[in-house]
Amino acid sequence: TNVVGTTNVLEASKNAKVKKFIYAASSSCYGLAQTPTDEKHVISTEYPYALTKYMGELATMHWSKIYKLPAISIRIFNAYGPRVRTTGLYGAVFGVFLKQKLANKPLTVVGDGKQTRDFLYVTDVAKAFLLAAKSKKKNEIYNLGASKPQSINRLAKIIGGEIIYIPKRPAEPDCTWANIKKIKRHLKWKPIVPFEYG
């Protein structure tokens, strides 16, 4: 779906002459990245979700360059908030913890929990997409995160409850950390919601 669905929407957007196409890409395309990670970092997709999301981004940039569809790709780091995904192999840790907490089950921390993630609240994500849509920028790629990594152990402590540790998955990064200088400069965007309040 990430690839076929995206190309279908790109083609429909081209035919409808939409003013701007914003693609929700994923920071997972960076794999085990050097941090903080900027948009020029080498791509290293380590699992199927990352690969298909990156293929969707490639398609978006292709339509932008070849068919002149004004498009921007935003590589979202670790978004969280209401209606966050709670299931699936690559479900966001925040959503998984929340589901476990509501079911009175222990929180399952992958690895030792010292790994960090660049969590960004969903309203900050929405604001970035709105600014991108209204901007004159096109054929650009932006990282989107808070640029303040938080440990999984800290997240588990904030949510509260019993914690059990499970083995680390292959290709699991120790840290995700967005360099957001480009999006700040181009779109005048900045994160607002502190981690503790989200």
What do these predicted regions represent?
Residues 1-11, 15, 19-20, 28-73, ...:
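Catalytic helix-loop patch of NAD(P)-dependent Rossmann-fold dehydrogenases
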Residues 112, 141-142, 150-181:
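C-terminal "lid/loop" region of Rossmann-like NAD(P)-dependent oxidoreductases
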Residues 129-133, 156-159, 180, 195:
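Hydrophobic "lid"/C-terminal helical patch
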Residues 54, 79-95, 103-105, 110, ...:
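Glycine/proline-rich active-site loop of Rossmann-fold NAD(P)-dependent oxidoreductases
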